[in-house]
Every structure is written in structure tokens, then in C-alpha cells.
UniProtKB/Swiss-Prot annotation:
Tissue spec: Expressed in inflorescences and flower buds. Not detected in roots, leaves or stems. Located exclusively in the tapetum of developing stamen.
Cofactor note: Binds 1 divalent metal cation per subunit.
Domain of life: Eukaryota
Protein name: Tapetum-specific methyltransferase 1
Pathway: Aromatic compound metabolism; phenylpropanoid biosynthesis
Membrane-spanning parts: none
Family label: Belongs to the class I-like SAM-binding methyltransferase superfamily. Cation-dependent O-methyltransferase family. CCoAMT subfamily.
Keyword match Oxidoreductase: no
Cofactor(s) for this UniProt protein: a divalent metal cation
């Protein structure tokens, strides 16, 4: 493999994956989200796989509504498909603090968020995730209802520690890509070299989460693996 990302999704049946997308996902995709998805593919090609798939987006939207989230965090934005999803799901006075080092990717998504009239909900911080989270912790104290993490997998343990100080008791922290294209069950020599560091980091992260008494967890086999952590203490 030449550094390309595999198609996102751990379902091995392409026919079943296509059925899910065509029957329940694409028909429910917001038109402007569809336009953003297509614009991301056009600009980034294979790297567009870094965005969340449509079925996962629908799940996140419903989750945010079920827990009545109003104040949320997103760590890792890319072109903002998941950010846009959450912004649409939040009430009019909802707020998202989004952190990413890449202003250009965010700007691509921002034009679609403006068309939808949800850009006022977003506070974008151009920063790497570590410094951005430290900035939030050192700034005005706020409680967050929900956090979505799709950033450097080698820092997931660090992100967990920081977010447990920011997300309220009973709030949800969602970590994306926790099954990492299905490579966690492969032998190391079967995994493309450019994917091994994240594979090792996620193997360790999943073990840590499994025994962490501060959170209740559920790992969901949607997209590339999504782990929900509900803060208990």
C-alpha cells in the first residue's frame, strides 16, 4: 500500500454496506452535508476517508439529540462533516468548541455551514489538539455535555484525561476510529507500515478504557469503530 487509506467501514460485505447506505443513510443525509462530502472528495481524493461516513453521522446526530446536548467539543475537524452534523443537531442556542490545526480544511466546510445558518454555533480554535485542550482547561470554566474525538490516535489517552475534566458527569465522550480499519485483529506484519503506529496506540487505548472505572463504555461497530464513554465520576 502506498500510504492510501482503506475504505472506511469494518463491514466485510460490500453488498450489505451498500444496502445500509442506499436504504437508510443517503436518503436521510442533509443536502448541504452531501454537498460538503462531495466537495471534500473533489479536493482531497482518498484522504476524504478521514471524514465520518454518512451512517455514523446519522448516529451522532441522534445521540446528540437524545442526550439534549447544548455545549459540545470536537477534537479534530478536517473539513467539518461531523462538526456540521452536530451543529445541525444542536438547538439554536447550542455551542460547539472545535479544535484543529488545519484552517483550510475547516474553511471548506464553513461555507456550507454558513449556507445552513449554523455557523454561529461554532467556536473554531486553530491549534493542535493538545494545546487547544490545555487552553480550554486554563480558560473560563465550562461544562460540556458531549465531546467527539477524531484526531491523533497516539494521544487518545491524553485526550481522555483532559476531557474527563471538561465533560460533565453523565456526559458522553465519543472516540472515533477505535477499530482502525479492522487492523486491530491482524498480525503486525499484515498491517501497512503507515497504519501501525495508530494500530498500536488504539490497542493500548482500548485496553485502558476497558478497565477505567471513571467511565461506562460501549464500542460500536459503525464506521471505523466508535467508542462511547459516559463519565461516571
Amino acid at each position: 500500500m502506498d500510504g492510501r487509506l482503506p475504505d472506511k467501514g469494518i463491514l466485510k460485505s460490500e453488498a450489505l454496506k451498500q444496502y445500509i447506505m442506499e436504504t437508510t443513510a443517503y436518503p436521510r443525509e442533509h443536502e448541504l452535508l452531501k454537498e460538503l462530502r462531495e466537495a471534500t472528495i473533489q479536493r482531497y481524493g482518498n484522504l476524504s476517508e478521514m471524514g465520518v461516513p454518512v451512517d455514523e453521522s446519522l448516529f451522532l446526530s441522534m445521540l446528540v439529540k437524545i442526550i439534549n446536548a447544548k455545549n459540545t467539543i470536537e477534537i479534530g475537524v478536517f473539513t467539518g462533516y461531523s462538526l456540521f452534523t452536530v451543529a445541525l443537531a444542536l438547538p439554536e442556542d447550542g455551542r460547539i468548541t472545535a479544535i484543529d490545526i488545519d484552517q483550510a480544511g475547516y474553511n471548506l466546510g464553513l461555507e456550507f455551514m454558513k449556507k445552513a445558518g449554523v455557523d454561529h454555533k461554532i467556536n473554531f480554535i486553530q491549534s493542535d489538539a493538545v494545546r487547544g485542550l490545555d487552553q480550554l482547561l486554563n480558560g473560563e470554566k465550562q461544562e460540556y455535555d458531549f465531546a467527539f474525538v477524531d484526531a491523533d490516535k497516539t494521544n487518545y489517552v491524553y485526550f481522555l484525561e483532559k476531557l474527563l475534566k471538561l465533560v460533565k458527569v453523565g456526559g458522553i465522550i465519543a472516540f472515533d476510529n477505535t477499530l482502525w480499519f479492522g487492523t486491530l485483529i491482524q498480525k503486525e506484519n499484515e498491517v501497512p507500515g503507515h497504519m501501525r503506529a495508530y494500530r498500536e496506540a488504539l490497542l493500548e487505548f482500548n485496553k485502558i478504557l476497558a478497565r477505567d472505572p471513571r467511565v461506562e463504555i460501549a464500542q460500536i461497530s459503525i464506521g471505523d469503530g466508535l467508542t462511547l464513554c459516559r463519565r461516571l465520576i
